[in-house]
Amino acid sequence: MNGQYKIFNNCDELVLSFNGLVECYDYTGMKDKCSYTFMDVNELNINLNKNGYYSLKCDLFDGRLDFDFYLNDFYVCNGNLVVDVNISSGMYEFGALSTLEFSLNDNKRIWLDMRGCAKKKYISASYLKNGFQKKIKNEVIVIEGKYIHDYYSFYCELGYSIFGNYGYIGSSLNAVYDILNDTIDKKINLIWKDSFISFKAIDNTVPEDYYQSSSEDILVLLNDYFNIILE
């Protein structure tokens, strides 16, 4: 079993391997429920059980793609395996692989074409591609507030302004704190352009179950690491 993707059962036994992972569709709209195609499966006998728990591990992205899943159903088609699963753990967000496949070398702010929570796919793609980065792109950080249209686009823009394209800064203030705390030793300058309108965009779209996540909370946190200039 030498495919770059491997599936393990809940006893950590290797049950199959394959050479390509295709994100098919989040067809129900239910969180974490989606379908994939496992391409070029290396085993003739598929040793999987419906309604079972499994783990996917792969050689790509230094293990950042790995996740656990519950297998609802599957079928074999032309040497490929189509599966219906619920993802139960991991930092991978469905759609991140497709984002990288079609926009890996795109230097523009590709999240601007994504609506609402779909921006989490870009954030997850940033984590897959670059992980936790340590090198800041510029001596002065410039946040372009005109590109912040909602809560999640703030995290896209912040990661972009600090680390560059596909810069990962998380999708919550707890994650921002952890990353900045490990990255910044002394305060550096941060210019936030079009700050007022971006504050409104953030505050009007904070998810209902997110507490202490307003623009005011963001400024309090960033002030510990930056000399902030609001424009």
What is each stretch, according to the model?
Residues 1-3, 8-113:
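Phosphate/adenylate-binding glycine loop and adjacent helical scaffold
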Residues 199-231:
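Helix-rich interaction surfaces within compact, conserved domain-sized segments
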